[in-house]
C-alpha cells in the first residue's frame, strides 16, 4: 500500500494548471460507445478512475489510441457483448463507480447491458434508483442477478417519454441522456442535473448529431436520432481540484496562481471560500490567491454563525466540503459545515481532531468548526485516506501542520488527482511517495 510522507510548513509559490475534470471525463468516455466512428477527447486526466474506465472499454473491444499525454481517440465499431457476462468484467466494473454510466449508452445503442454493483468511495448510501427508473421509463427491463451481484438490462426498442426525476442526480441524468439520444421519439427530463459537466456531455452529443435542447437548465428535451457520429471534444478543468488548490494556498499562507480555470463554470466555489475569509482575484481566466497571514470567517448579518452547505448546481459541490472544513480549522471564527448529500463523508474529522483541530461532529451530516486563527498549528499525524475527497483534505491539513505526517492508502487520492505529489512539490511543497 502506497503512502505520502508530508513535511508541513512549506510555503507554496508559482503557477499551476488544473487537470481535466474527472467527473466529466467519466461521462464523455462512456458516451464514446454511442457511435461506431472515431471520437477524440482532449484534456483527459491521468488518474486511476479514468484509466481504469479506459482499460475496461478496451477490454470491451473499443479501439483506443493515446494521442498525447492527455488526449485519446476512441472507436467503438465492434463491441464484444459476450464480455459483459465474464467474471473479468464483473470484477473490474464492480470496483469502479463510473461503470454504472455504461448502462445508458449500451442499452441505447445495443439494446442490452450488464453492470455489476459499482464501487467507488465509501461515503454513505449512494442509490442508483434515478439511473434505473429513468432508463426503465424509456422501456428497458432490469433483472438483478443475486448470484453475480449484477444487473442484467434489456431494452431493444427504447421510446422517448416524459419523466420527473426525484433527485437531480448528475450521473443519473448523464445515464438517462445517453440512453435517450438514440431512442425513438422525444424524451423530456424535468429536474435534470445541469452542472457544467452535464452541459459538456450534451454539447458533445449534439456535435455527434444528437438533438438536445434546454442545455444548462433543469428541463432537457431530447429528440431521438437513428445514429451518432464522431467528434472532437475538450474536457473542462476540474473545479474540485481548483478548489483544492485554493485550500492549499490558504492553509500554507501562500501566493499561487491557478491558470485557465474556466471561471464561469466554477459556480459558488469562489464565493464559498470568500465566506471563510480567503482572498482571491480573477485575472483573465486565472485565479490569484495572495499570501494571507490570517483570515476571518464571515458571519450572517444578524451575527449568527455562518453555514456552508452543499446543494445541486449552481450550489456548492459536496466534493469540496471536506477541503473547506480543513481550511476553516485555521481561520478566525466558527462555521457550520452541512453535508446534505452523503451521511458518512464527515467521519474523517476524527483525524483532524487528533491533529488538534477544534471540531464538533453534530451528527453524520453536520460539523461545527471553531477556528483557532493563525496562532494555531495542526500537529503532524499518521493517518489513512478513507476516500478521494477526505484524502485530499487530509493532505492539505498535513501541508499546514507542524512536523512530518504520513498518509496511507493514497490510491484513494490517486483515483481523483493527477500526480498530485509531483505538482505540489514543483510549487515548493515537500511530499514523498513511498511504495
What kind of feature is each model-predicted range?
Residues 1-435:
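Short, structured segments at the rim of ligand-binding sites
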Amino acid at each position: 500500500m502506497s503512502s505520502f510522507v508530508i513535511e508541513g510548513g512549506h510555503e507554496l509559490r508559482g503557477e499551476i494548471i488544473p487537470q481535466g475534470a474527472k467527473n466529466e471525463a467519466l461521462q464523455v468516455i462512456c458516451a464514446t460507445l454511442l457511435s461506431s466512428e472515431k471520437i477524440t477527447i482532449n484534456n483527459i486526466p491521468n488518474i486511476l478512475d479514468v484509466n481504469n474506465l479506459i482499460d475496461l472499454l478496451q477490454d470491451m473491444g473499443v479501439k483506443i489510441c493515446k494521442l498525447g499525454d492527455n488526449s485519446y481517440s476512441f472507436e467503438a465499431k465492434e463491441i464484444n457483448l459476450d464480455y459483459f457476462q465474464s467474471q473479468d468484467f464483473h470484477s473490474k466494473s464492480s470496483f469502479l463507480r463510473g461503470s454504472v454510466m455504461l448502462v445508458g449508452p449500451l442499452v441505447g445503442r445495443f439494446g442490452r447491458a450488464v453492470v455489476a454493483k459499482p464501487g467507488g468511495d465509501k461515503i454513505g448510501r449512494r442509490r442508483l434508483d434515478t439511473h434505473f427508473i429513468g432508463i426503465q421509463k424509456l422501456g428497458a427491463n432490469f433483472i438483478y442477478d443475486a448470484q453475480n451481484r449484477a444487473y442484467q438490462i434489456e431494452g431493444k426498442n427504447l421510446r422517448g417519454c416524459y419523466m420527473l426525476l426525484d433527485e437531480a442526480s448528475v450521473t443519473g441524468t448523464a445515464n438517462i441522456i445517453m440512453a435517450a439520444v438514440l431512442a425513438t421519439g422525444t424524451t423530456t427530463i424535468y429536474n435534470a442535473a445541469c452542472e457544467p459537466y452535464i452541459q459538456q456531455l450534451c454539447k458533445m452529443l449534439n456535435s455527434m448529431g444528437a438533438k438536445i435542447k434546454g442545455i444548462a437548465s433543469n428541463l432537457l428535451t431530447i429528440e431521438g436520432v437513428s445514429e451518432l457520429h464522431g467528434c472532437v471534444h475538450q474536457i473542462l478543468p476540474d473545479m474540485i481540484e481548483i478548489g483544492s488548490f485554493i485550500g492549499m494556498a490558504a492553509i500554507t499562507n501562500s501566493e499561487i496562481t491557478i491558470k485557465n480555470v474556466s471561471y464561469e463554470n466554477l459556480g459558488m466555489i469562489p464565493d464559498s471560500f470568500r465566506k471563510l475569509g480567503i482572498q482571491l482575484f480573477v485575472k483573465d481566466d486565472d485565479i490569484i490567491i495572495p499570501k494571507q497571514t490570517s483570515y476571518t470567517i464571515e458571519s450572517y448579518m444578524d451575527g449568527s454563525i455562518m453555514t456552508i452547505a452543499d446543494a445541486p448546481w449552481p450550489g456548492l459541490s459536496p466534493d469540496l466540503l471536506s477541503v473547506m472544513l480543513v481550511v476553516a480549522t485555521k481561520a478566525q471564527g466558527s462555521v457550520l459545515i452541512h453535508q446534505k448529500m452523503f451521511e458518512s463523508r464527515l467521519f474523517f474529522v476524527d483525524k483532524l481532531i487528533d491533529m488538534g483541530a477544534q471540531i464538533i461532529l453534530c451528527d453524520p451530516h453536520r460539523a461545527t468548526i471553531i477556528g483557532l486563527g493563525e496562532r494555531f498549528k495542526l500537529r503532524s499525524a499518521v493517518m489513512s485516506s478513507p476516500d478521494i475527497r477526505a484524502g485530499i483534505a487530509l493532505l492539505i491539513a498535513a501541508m499546514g501542520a507542524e512536523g512530518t505526517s504520513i498518509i496511507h492508502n493514497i490510491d484513494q487520492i490517486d483515483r481523483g488527482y493527477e500526480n498530485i505529489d509531483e505538482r505540489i512539490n514543483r510549487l515548493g511543497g515537500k511530499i514523498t511517495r513511498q511504495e
